């Protein structure tokens, strides 16, 4: 089964996330487990944790279909030792928060070298950060999101994702989330069914489909290779519907969270219905 959803709000309490997902007809969802604009947040209350788990169960959401995202403040490749330490501590906290909720995944952007080190040195720092976080948690999988390649962000090439996985000690607890807008912006063509098929075959060759743990289904405002991370509603950008039809019809994308991060949250329910209609 295809598991579609969106990145929903936790306003009023994290236990509201599954309710918000259910309201749009989702069968998966993404969320932040804290205020993503702050380095530190108070611990989750036991009552909120219990209510979150109960609402997930009541809504039919399995934990493997929920894709929490870490704070955008975190840079696991930061060349500054003090800032790197702060990012690592925050990432470990994110892993432990996810674990306390019973979640199985944590989605994150790999990191940036800020023109202060080589890309290879930055990849090593990111991999070391992943290994540290896995040592400080017991069951959550670190899910690396591909990037558009803006600025000095790494993770825009499949080879970089493969390198991070190779340097991760416990490969059973590392995976990838493919964002379609980021793929397109990074130069991987998705504008036709043939092009999209070749892009996913290349991912399989370089990284391996066995590591795919989720996707962000976003169209792109800018042309292929722009390196600009600007999302559009599905079918209303430069990608078009062919790639999304392929995802919805291919068995390779079964039973992983397929998450909308498109700009019109009021239209998510309709986008979900439209995507299911592509099957």
UniProtKB/Swiss-Prot annotation:
Keywords: DNA damage, DNA repair, Endonuclease, Hydrolase, Metal-binding, Nuclease, Zinc. GO terms for molecular function: deoxyribonuclease IV (phage-T4-induced) activity; DNA binding; DNA-(apurinic or apyrimidinic site) endonuclease activity; phosphoric diester hydrolase activity; zinc ion binding. The keyword Hydrolase applies. SMART domains: AP2Ec (SM00518). Binds 3 Zn(2+) ions. Gene3D superfamilies: Divalent-metal-dependent TIM barrel enzymes (3.20.20.150). Zn(2+) 2 binds at residues 145, 179, 216, 261. GO terms for biological process: base-excision repair. SUPFAM superfamilies: Xylose isomerase-like (SSF51658). Its EC number is 3.1.21.2. Its cofactor is Zn(2+). It catalyses: Endonucleolytic cleavage to 5'-phosphooligonucleotide end-products. It comes from the Bacteria. The keyword DNA damage applies. Belongs to the AP endonuclease 2 family. Endonuclease IV plays a role in DNA repair. It cleaves phosphodiester bonds at apurinic or apyrimidinic (AP) sites, generating a 3'-hydroxyl group and a 5'-terminal sugar phosphate. HAMAP family: Nfo (MF_00152). This is Probable endonuclease 4. It comes from Chlorobium luteolum (strain DSM 273 / BCRC 81028 / 2530). The lineage of its organism: Bacteria, Pseudomonadati, Chlorobiota, Chlorobiia, Chlorobiales.
